[in-house]
């Protein structure tokens, strides 16, 4: 490898690491701030950390193309200001040769992004879902608020009049809709919510259970003691149905071949997400290529050192915005997936064309 290429890469890599750490940390902190309320619910620091660290793969997957562009443009602009690019250009090095060091780095980042997209991203979301269910089940008692309708699970809502010490609750109402044909309401004077084998169970005292049967008839049952087991989502992680799974929990191969049992709108969203996982990592190469193509076309001028960077950034933002607009349409109509690939191909073609052909 030529010396100037090694020099360029040695300049790009440290800045790329710094920018990745800085930008990801800022976005990550904003996500963490939204979850700080969990400390008021008694969550342990280790459980909180295990939860928030699982968000990082998603952030990296989304941010890496933009981070790579920032690092590349910053280094190349510095090299131009210091006239090192000018010296190389006057010595016969063309634009495509100047861009190669950055493109090598971009290609490496693209491969990393594909690994995140294909393996780490779905794995982290599966674990994230599991951790959320673990926290919900094990801290459920502290998360229930007085005089508020608390949605414990998808089909169970609980109202508590008053919470006492020793995990005792007074004035309990439980709305149980797990059986859609026979919804029930339970009223209890008091009770406790305990965890047995990671399963939250209400132990109720002196109350009334009302239920409608399939014919709409109301049945009532009074009780002195009643136990209601809440569905433990964490124990059902491996049994999560196709309808309950989120798109980020699927691997790419699963997204491309969704289950026939799914509704058509869910199938379309999953297939669109699969192509997003395939297309977006490519922008780790395409966006730096396009940005450098625009940047290197501008001749050096002390008065307008910022203009090449500005036009390069605007070009990248325009292509990125078009991609996400088309991706949004594709999640509703799969015909727009071809437009997503076309946008990528056009951006790459323009970038390579501008790098290869000299400015007239």
Swiss-Prot record:
GO terms for cellular component: ATP-binding cassette (ABC) transporter complex. The keyword Glycosyltransferase does not apply. Pfam families: LptF_LptG (PF03739). Its main location: membrane. It is a multi-pass membrane protein. One of its GO terms (biological process) is lipopolysaccharide transport. InterPro entries: LptG/LptF_permease. The chain crosses the membrane at residues 12-32, 52-72, 96-116, 278-298, 306-326, 336-356. This is Uncharacterized protein RP871. It comes from Rickettsia prowazekii (strain Madrid E). The lineage of its organism: Bacteria, Pseudomonadati, Pseudomonadota, Alphaproteobacteria, Rickettsiales.
């Amino acid at each position: 490898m030529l010396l100037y290429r090694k020099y360029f890469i040695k300049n790009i890599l440290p800045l790329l690491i710094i920018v990745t750490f800085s930008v990801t940390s800022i976005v990550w902190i904003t996500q963490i701030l939204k979850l700080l309320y969990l400390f008021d619910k008694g969550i342990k620091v280790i459980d909180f950390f295990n939860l928030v660290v699982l968000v990082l793969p998603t952030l990296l997957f989304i941010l890496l193309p933009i981070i790579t562009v920032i690092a590349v443009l910053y280094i190349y602009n510095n090299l131009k200001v210091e006239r090192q690019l000018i010296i190389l250009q006057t010595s016969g090095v063309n634009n495509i040769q100047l861009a190669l060091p950055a493109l090598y780095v971009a290609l490496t980042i693209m491969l990393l992004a594909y690994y995140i997209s294909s393996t780490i991203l779905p794995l982290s979301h599966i674990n994230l879902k599991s951790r959320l269910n673990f926290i919900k089940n094990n801290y459920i008692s502290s998360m229930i608020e007085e005089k508020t309708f608390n949605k414990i699970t998808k089909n169970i809502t609980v109202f508590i009049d008053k919470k006492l010490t020793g995990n005792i609750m007074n004035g309990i109402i439980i709305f149980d809709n797990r059986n859609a044909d026979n919804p029930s309401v339970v009223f209890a004077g008091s009770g406790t919510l305990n965890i047995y084998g990671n399963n939250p169970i209400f132990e109720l005292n002196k109350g009334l259970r009302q239920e409608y049967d399939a014919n709409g008839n109301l049945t009532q049952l009074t009780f002195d003691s009643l136990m209601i087991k809440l569905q433990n989502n964490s124990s059902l992680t491996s049994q999560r149905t196709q309808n309950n799974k989120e798109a980020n929990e699927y691997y790419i191969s699963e997204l491309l071949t969704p289950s026939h049992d799914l509704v058509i709108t869910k199938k379309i969203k999953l297939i669109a997400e699969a192509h997003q996982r395939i297309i977006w990592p490519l922008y780790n190469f395409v966006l730096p290529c396009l940005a450098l193509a625009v940047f290197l076309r501008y001749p050096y001028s002390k008065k307008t050192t910022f203009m090449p960077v500005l036009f390069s950034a605007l070009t990248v933002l325009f292509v990125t915005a078009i991609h996400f607009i088309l991706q949004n349409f594709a999640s509703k109509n799969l015909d727009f997936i071809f437009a997503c690939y076309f946008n990528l191909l056009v951006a790459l073609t323009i970038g390579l064309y501008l790098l290869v052909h000299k400015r007239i």
